[in-house]
Amino acid sequence: MDPQHGRSVDTKNAIAFYSNAKPPLHMLSNFYATVIQFDGKVYPSTEHAFQAQLSVHLEAYTLTSAIGKLTPEACHLVGFPDNKKHAKCDFWSKKDMVGILAKMLIAKHAQLGLKQKVTREESEDLFKKILLEKFRSNSTARKVLLDTKDAYLYEFVRSSNKRFQKNGEIERWGAMIVDGKVVGDNQMGALMMWVRKKLRKELSEKP
């Protein structure tokens, strides 16, 4: 995807999406609970499907129930003490944001050297396939995405500007918009706009 950092954006025609966004925009988040069938397996969120492909032990991502609740085995892998398991799982499940659990698990795998290394292009191609599956199969989420029309989409990451100002670090997946400029590479936003365009094309070609 084309780099987005430094791009000029009309703030009146820009839409932020993230796990805590007000409904229905929260459905655009990868953490949102929605069943994804990918490569012969079923996952409770797009984040689960994506992170599973990066894990040396893909089966770890089958240790969640259909709604993303962690099993005791998965809790152990993530490193949650038993007394914190239910609080963590219940909090994110109530918010329909079970994908955060997949993020926690891959972070643990990275610490243990169990995370596969993929190129930027490989990760983007993987996300394209998974996101297309999400929005093709979930008509409600698809409508939310298509209803953004031609708005500039960006995954809001609050720390983007602070990190850039402090040490020049450019956030890869998300961004902020500051004074009409994108601060961060916003690759997830770019992917979402790519998916939106492709879905529109598919719908227009239907008889």
Predicted feature descriptions by range:
Residues 1-207:
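Charged, low-complexity intrinsically disordered segments
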